[in-house]
Amino acid sequence: MSFSSSQGGDTRRSQTRSVSRQESAAASDSKRDFADSVYPPFCKKLDVDLPEFIREGDIEYPFEDTDDLGDENKIRGNWSSRIDYLLSALGFTFGIGTLWRFPYYCHIYGGGAFIVPYLVMLFIAGLPIVFMELALGQFASIGIGVATLLISCIICIYMNMVAAWSIFYFTNSMKFALPWAACTNEWNTFNCSVWNRDSVSKCVAHNGTLLRNGSCVVNKADFFNDDNASLSVLTSFDISANVMPSAEYFHHEVLMMSDRLDNVGTINWQLAICLLIAWLLIFLFLFKGVKSAGKVVYVGVLAAYVILFVLFVRLLTLPGSLSGLIHFYTPRWNALYDLTVWGGAAVQVFYSLSSCTGGLITLASYSRFHNNMFKDIWLLSIADVLTSILAGALVYSAVGFMCYEMDVPIDQFQLKAGAHLVFIVLPEAIAKLPVAPIYALMYFVMIVFIILSTTMFVMETIVSSICDEFPERLRRNHRHVLAFTCLAFYSLGVPLCTAAGIYWLVLLDHFTPTWPLIILAFFECMAVSWVYGVDNFLDNIKWMIRFYPPPYIFWKIQWKFICPLVFLMILSFVWVGYSPFTYEDYEYPEWANSVGWGIALTPIAMIPLCALVKFCRARGPFPQRWRDLLCPEDDWGPALAIHRAEYYPLQIPEARRLILPPPPNSKGTNGVDVMAGGLEDYSLPSKATLSDGTTGSNRVLKASFLSPFDRETAI
């Protein structure tokens, strides 16, 4: 009984194993037949004689995600959300240039009238180039070129030095009294003067004498003692003769500035440590690429805007601030007849939007392929205008308050661009506020966030470009490339911590992010509009956002004709009005101007140099090399196959099997020769759609029409 039962069990197990072997053999045969079949894996054959297909799913690859739940590009990555992308782009465009250049241009170029050429240049030059860069980055999902890469490196090196200054100020603001609020420090000179309207009134009420250092001497015996013998009486504040304590603190204590460019001096190790902290923050923010950077902007960008608004409201409550706003924003319409004003407006538009620095291309390259970047450009442009106006209002209210305190007419106040405005004028106004250290901490936190929000994405531009150039070796080692680049840039930035560092920083800022960006914009616009084809580019935009940007003819004319002409006009304005530049009272020598021109022309020289290298590496006769040089690379287009299949289905292996004829003597599963009748009788499946919208029932691929190369690409 037990024997028969065990024998029956063995029989059933052997039958089961036999059936399993038959099923596995059948499955392997079916897989082999399916692999040799002409039908793609995402389609199911309905009838061999009438080849029609139904979709069983999207084309999927191990590096792609089509369910909108994760990253589309599993290798390169994408933004976690559209909010991350928009805040990052907003933080990138809200650079320090908006704060330290726009108010100055309004001051010298017609006050409120300057906003008119600024808006015009934004519309006809800034907006089109921003749209072009966002579209290029999102379409190709790759990094930038060599010329833009070099400019990005220079900007990143010296801009992080400004962040180091802000960190130095931040740490020294954690005191009960701000060190730049008085003239009693060891770094102050005889010309340092403190003038406070309330202190003067109190001193006069007590029949006292106000000294340069801001102290009031009531007793005449005290006035003639040894401590006050070297101090003169301050009867009024003369801007040309007296120096604000914030200016001496910045030049003598923070920078330890020398008297000329070639007097390097020693390294200020306090600044070197602050610079190291700035680069460590950049490394931590970009440790996980755009994933971590996208989260940092939630704090950095939003906090910067909140602090900017809070400081503006606080300064607006002070006496004289409203007079400053009225004075500086009062339009002087005759300035619009000066072409220099229009050139300055165009330069400021490029500087404010951070165009042609590569950051916008990199930010857009991490977006999803079908993100509506047409909506993004309007959001960024409106935010840029509002931010510029708010930054100008902050500066003008501070200047009005300072002029009231110093009893100086507003039109006599010497407003200067650059570090003078950010690290001298505004800190001087903040030092006169009640509980000044709290506002100083807020202000320098804002400056640090503004600078790092820009430099971290410039840094990501550099790192991603290097990784995209060598994807097999470096893309999986993004952090190593980031660490090495941060260390290299820190080493290159240490010379800016010397006594002559401010002179070199001003030189780099004067020559790098100005007219070279306009030249890059010109070549970029010409290459896209005239070489690649503006119609092709607009088709690519439609491919991504599923409609042509309205109005179609406007963008076509802008990119093809207006933008190149505007860029050439801007260059002529800038170059014709060029004069040797200065910092404070120091005039740069001729050799320094030559060095600046060399630094500015080096990235521009990379454009013809790289073209020459490409031409020499090409094969064939001269006309063929020239043609190949002007044609896109074979891998140009969307990075993911799922997106290429939307417009060029024959480029994708699975889609190619769907549309191209199968090899000769191919049999279906029922043994019928699907190639019976020859290639001339082969028609596309009725549901297979080509890039021009025609279906298989409407087009026939002839052997005479497709060359062997065309059978492989079929574009």
PLM features: residue spans?
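A generic transmembrane alpha-helix motif of multi-pass inner-membrane proteins
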Residues: 494-496, 506-529, 551-668, 715
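Hydrophobic, membrane-embedded alpha-helices of multi-pass small-molecule transporters
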Residues: 87-97, 155, 212, 225, ...
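Hydrophobic alpha-helical segments and their helix-loop junctions in multi-pass secondary transporters
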Residues: 129, 160-164, 168-177, 305-328, ...
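Extracellular/lumenal N-termini and interhelical loops of multi-pass eukaryotic membrane proteins
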Residues: 163-263, 321-334, 405-428, 520-522, ...
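Transmembrane helix-boundary motif of multi-pass solute transporters/channels
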Residues: 84-120, 131-132, 281, 286-292, ...
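Transmembrane helix-loop boundary segments of multi-pass membrane transporters
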Residues: 103-121, 137-141, 148, 291-300, ...
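Membrane-embedded translocation segments of transport machinery
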Residues: 43-79, 86, 290, 294-459, ...
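Membrane-interface "cap" regions at the ends of multi-pass membrane proteins
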Residues: 2-100, 129-134, 192, 201-204, ...
